[in-house]
Amino acid sequence: GERVTLKAGRSRFVLATLPATDFPVIDELAQQQALTLAQADLRRLLDKTHFSMAQQDVRYYLNGMLFETDGKMLRTVATDGHRLALCEMDMPTKSGVQQVIIPRKGVLELQRLLGTEGEVTITIGSNHVRAQIGDVRFTSKLIDGRFPEYSRVIPSAPQKAIVADREVLRAALQRTAILANEKYRGIRLALKKNSLTL
């Protein structure tokens, strides 16, 4: 087989290699849409929704994140069938209407690569998505499936709305979560006028 030799100072390493022809070749992306936005904006969209992705669901289309443009808004949506997270932002430039599902591993890798400064260019093809971040080009396959119609489960005109101090509610949920167990994972919310009991 092929070998590669590495030399550094007085050290010498000979390593066996695999045939380069076996390395998967990603076809040239047949671009359907490209958009450029701030890395911080894309990172925020991913950070706010990634926790709701399924991990090993038989409904394979849930093991990723919906990346959607409707011409005016850019939206990320994730659900595992029990919870749903959605985050959106105004599009920096006008774009076409498109929905693609990026696999969980691709989303997590993108989060790792994205910084807080500079821009990222997202190119969407029929089977792949590509992110150009500085001199790094990241390409991921897309999940071939139909994401659930998430808009049907989000109330358009909710009958009741709760307004609470975010940190106070978070602290209360963390305290009650201590008593949640494998059998009963839920936390019951009891609403009364001007009070919420967990």
Language model segments and positions:
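Structural preference for solvent-exposed beta-strand-turn elements
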Residues: G1-L198
